[in-house]
Amino acid sequence: MFIRTFPSARVLARVSLANVLHVWQGLGYNRRAKYLHEAAKTINDKYNKYNKRFPDTVEEIETLPGVGHYTARAVAAFAFNKPEVFVETNIRTVFFYHLGPRRKLSDQQLLPLVERALAQSRMEPREFYAALMDYGAHLKRQGIKLNAKSAHYKKQSAFEGSTRQVRGAILRELLKHHSTLATLMQRIPRNQQDVANELSRLMAEGLVALHGRYFAIQE
């Protein structure tokens, strides 16, 4: 649905953030949709700087909003078939499953192993990573959950009753219409301080703006 609606960076850059968030619903953190929207605008605005349709080096990709070290390498590998090395949750699962480490390992310890496996593979980089991630997802579907062996592992809190739930509720209301603080507090069945706190955070992140007495999705 998202790709069908916004098939290119140029199309995505020309729509409002509210439009992006509406289509993004159910696809994950709304902050990521905002970063993607901003990245599309950056690519569109700096077309002449890159002298091509899309930045294709890790260094260029890392300049895009919200793109970090590993994400830039994942984009380079999948979009441009470059032999960049990165680790994500399903890749960790595969290596932990076959290594069976007795102690927790960091991504820095896993990266040389991924690099060696990629170099020895007869597959193209994008095929290698697609297969690796599909395999990791398959292991998880079989009930094999090993990410606790990662030195970076943090157990995610339950969604029910979380601040993530409050943020989602606020954005859903504001996608329908502009609202005052009093209206939001009335419509969202949570502690009023929680609603106020998350509104402040959403404003700080550039997802929500205040126009007089009314809150709205940032334009």
Predicted regions and their residues:
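Short amphipathic alpha-helical interaction segments
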Residues: 189-203
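Catalytic cores of DNA base-excision repair glycosylases
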Residues: 1-165, 177-178, 185-193
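Residues in the recognition helix of alpha-helical DNA-binding motifs
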Residues: 75, 197-201, 216-218
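Accessory DNA-binding and partner-docking regions appended to nucleic-acid-acting proteins
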Residues: 162-167, 216-218
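Core nucleotide-handling region used for phosphoryl-transfer chemistry
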Residues: 174
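A short, conserved structural fragment
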Residues: 203-215
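Short secondary-structure capping/turn micro-motifs that flank functional sites
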Residues: 40, 218-219
